[in-house]
Every structure is written in C-alpha cells, then in structure tokens.
Amino acid sequence: MKKRVSKFISLALTAAMVLSLAGCGSSDSAESAPAESGTETTASGETANSTEESTQTAASGEKIVNIGVTDSLGSINPFVIDQTFINKYAVDLQFLPLVEFDENLNFEYILADSITTEDNKNFIVHINDDATWSDGNPITAYDVEYSFLRLASPIVANATLVYNVFEGVGDDGFVEEGATGVSGVQVIDDKTIQFTTKEPMSMITFQSAYACYLHTMPKHVIEKFSEAELTTQDWFNHPDVVSGPFMVTDYDTDHYISYVANKNYWK
C-alpha cells in the first residue's frame, strides 16, 4: 500500500509542478522552503508552517510536503470544476478518476482496473474489486453511474464536461433533470459499467477526454442532496468520505489547499 500511495503522490506532485495543481499565493507571500518529509500536503504560495511549528513537526515524526504553484484554484467540488489541470489534480487527490496519465504520459488504471471495447462505441469499464470508500463501503458501478448523471444534469450545469457524445444525452450535453439512467451508461453488475457513444471513438479519446475527468462520488453519502445543492454544499469543500489517498483539511481559493493522508486508502 505504501508503495502505491507513494507512486500516486509522486504522480500528483509531478503534475502539480508541471501543470499547476492548486492555488497561488498572494504577492507578499513568503517563499516556501522545502518541507520535512510528510503525511500532510499543502499546495500553496505561502510558507505552511513557522519555524517553531516545523521543529515540532519534525520532532513528532509528521511528514509534510509544500508545493508552490502559479495559478489560483477555482473549486475543489467535482461537480463544478472545469477541465483545467489545476482543478483536476486538486480533486484527484480525494476522488479518483477511472484512469490517469503516469509520469511517462501513458494511461494508468486508477479506480478502474480494465477498460475494453470491441467496436469503439461500447466501452466496458471494470472497477477494481478492492476499491473502497474511506468509510469502508465498496466503490461500485452505481457510484460511477450516479456521478455521470449528476455531472450531466442541467441543474448542475457543468458546461465544460461535455457528455453529448454518449447515447441518451442531449446535444447540449445534458440529461433530463432528475434522470436515474440513460441508454449510454448502463450498469452491468456492481463492479462493471458500460459507456456507449453515438459515434465510434478511439480508446485514447475515451480515456483522455472522459475517463480521466470522471471523478466518482459516493452515492450513498451525497444522494441526499438535491441536484441544485450539489454545487453549493459545503460538504464538497471538506468531504469526510473519499476514495483517494488524501482528504482536505483547510482550503482558501486564492491562497492554499491543505490535505491530510487518508488512513483508510484502499490502494
């Protein structure tokens, strides 16, 4: 598990430094010094800890990584983020995508453990059998379906994640309000889901444009919210159930975002 977490962190940190993971510091921010090795990750333009705090941290054995970036973070709510890398990788640390680019820009399975197609229209995605939420519940194809439907909701109205290429989704990229299913997204079993496109699509396009950006959310936790509430609920700024290796502890759009390790990370 430690090896897998380290690999994921390395990938995320590489992406952060190259593609701007999270928010920038103000113009009068102090330059962040290299942190002690960490369990908490702070993406910031400011020094995350004072000298005294750093000394206490080192003494206690905590491990902290500070990352300075140049862009500001729009949101960490998966339902309202755009397709910029800064937002994507900030969310990735909490809510895993189906696949991700590795350090060599090859696709690596993350939440999924296989994606197959025989006709470049029907894409069969299998969710890793070991995948669980931080509360111990299994991550299922129903979570993936729910997340897709809400991202394509006209009430949520995320205009950057365009799903009009899938059967059952309107040309405007939205499903009907309150939709519980569409023909282009079919759950086969608890761990398998099929995506069907209107026209043939290469596997590379499916993975890079859709599987990389579909952050699966815990249906059993958030289905109590109305579609309108999905864009305004504070829960998404401090989620207590995640699938990724980290959880947000503190967040300021213009300055920083801080994470702590998810002790129940399944990888």
Predicted region positions:
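N-terminal lobe/hinge region of extracytoplasmic solute-binding protein
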Residues: 68-119, 149, 241
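Gly/Pro-rich hinge or "lid" segments in bacterial periplasmic/extracellular proteins
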Residues: 201, 209-267
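Bacterial lipoprotein signal-peptidase II cleavage site
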Residues: 24-33
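Surface-exposed binding/hinge segments that line
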Residues: 116, 161-223, 250-252
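Short, well-ordered beta-strand elements
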Residues: 61-71, 122-126, 144-147, 193-194, ...
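Aromatic- and charge-enriched surface segment that lines or borders ligand/interaction sites
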Residues: 113-160
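Bacterial N-terminal signal peptides that target proteins for export
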Residues: 2-9
